[in-house]
Curated annotation (Swiss-Prot):
One of its GO terms (biological process) is tRNA wobble position uridine thiolation. Disulfide bonds join C94-C193. Residues 143-145, 298-299 are annotated as: Interaction with tRNA. Its main location: cytoplasm. Coiled coil: none annotated. Its EC number is 2.8.1.13. The active site is at C94, C193. The record marks H120, Q331 as: Interaction with tRNA. This is tRNA-specific 2-thiouridylase MnmA. The keyword Cell cycle does not apply. It comes from the Bacteria. It comes from Nostoc sp. (strain PCC 7120 / SAG 25.82 / UTEX 2576).
Length: 352
């Protein structure tokens, strides 16, 4: 019998993925990662629901303590980034370093299993012509999570299954209901796990970064107001600046060194190109010449036509056909050919 370890968060998606694979004849082992430090996190609602689902399905349930890894790779990563004036994207980092990598290792070393599965909405396809595993958008475009999975290596893609990739979200709920799963009607998470457990990103960051007052200035250096911490702002932000101006002003730069928030009109927050580092080429090998693609510079943004120019040291330059508003350092840029993820990386801070 084929064996698979399913990552269970306690939500409907991962629960249904486990049920589907169980029905397909897999020997399924549920695995929950204990991520958060703090009182009550060892018996959080998600962990309790995951255990209940395993009991319903009659499968084993393992819990792995990943709190120190999560602290290093996610909490410290976020705090360092925000403190330096960037807006990190924790989810892609978490998928690679906290979830998929450790899950594959644990499954292999502790459970004698070479396949894992999750409830992500994405698809994996092996291309015999190139010998590469390709990452594709999910059938349900509205739920597609390929943007957050761009950093998975070929080895991790080869070991992973996404049972929900060919399904609509409504089908997931229906299957969960048909199986009588406790999580069938469970609401979806609406924010980052850290935000949900702390109330807001501001509250989370203020636990680690002491608010420090400074100037809000325009691009000419004129003081327009005061802020209470650079880490409370992000590129492109308009609301909550607390300044009066005859025209809309947006955050165009976060100067953590001089503790300044720089604002300007919309044109100042618009760029024709950017550079990206820590690039991972997914469905194709790294090209030696520029390629055409469609890029997303944030999760819910529409793909925009772009020329991807390879640089040295796992970097690329993105030249947009049309100038883009609010390109945010620290966020992921992921480029596609249709539904196929070609590659992605982290947007760099702009050089002056």
């Amino acid at each position: 019998m084929k064996k698979v370890v399913v990552g269970l968060s306690g939500g409907v998606d991962s629960s249904t993925a486990a049920a589907i694979l169980h029905n397909q004849g897999y020997e399924v082992i549920g695995l929950t990662l204990w991520l958060m430090k703090g009182k009550g996190q060892c018996c959080s609602e998600g962990m309790i629901d995951a255990a209940y689902i395993c009991e319903q399905l009659g499968i084993p349930h393992e819990v792995v303590d990943m709190r120190d890894v999560f602290q290093t790779h996610i909490v410290d990563y976020l705090v360092t980034g925000y403190g330096a004036g960037i807006t990190p994207l924790p989810c892609s980092q978490c998928n690679k370093t906290v979830k998929f990598g450790p899950m594959v290792q644990y499954a292999s070393e502790k459970l004698g299993c070479d396949r894992i599965a999750t409830g992500h909405y994405a698809r994996i396809r092996y291309d015999e012509a190139t010998g590469r595993y390709q990452l594709l958008r999910a059938v349900d475009r509205n739920k597609d999570q390929s943007y957050f999975l761009y950093d998975l290596s070929q080895d991790l893609l080869a070991a992973s299954l996404f049972p929900l990739g060919e399904m609509e979200k409504a089908d997931t709920r229906r299957i969960a209901t048909e199986h009588g799963l406790k999580t069938a009607d469970k609401p979806e998470s609406q924010d980052l796990c850290l935000v949900e457990s702390n109330g807001s990103m501001r509250a989370f960051l203020d636990k680690y970064i002491a608010p420090k007052k400074g100037d809000i200035v325009d691009t000419a250096g004129k003081v327009l107001g005061q802020h209470d911490g650079v880490h409370h702002y992000t590129i492109g932000q308009r609301k909550g600046l607390g300044i009066a101006a005859p025209e809309p002003l947006y955050v165009v730069e976060l100067d953590a060194v001089h503790n300044k928030v720089v604002v300007g009109d919309r044109t100042k927050a618009t760029q024709e190109e950017c550079t990206v580092n820590r690039v991972n080429w997914v469905s194709i090998a790294e090209p030696s010449t520029p390629i055409r693609a469609a890029v997303q510079i944030r999760y819910r943004s529409a793909p925009e036509p772009v020329t991807v120019i390879p640089l040295e040291n796992s970097r690329v330059r993105l030249v947009f056909d049309e100038p883009q508003f609010s390109i945010t350092p620290g966020q992921a840029a992921v480029w596609y050919d249709g539904n196929k993820v070609l590659g992605g990386g982290i947007i760099e801070q702009f050089s002056k």
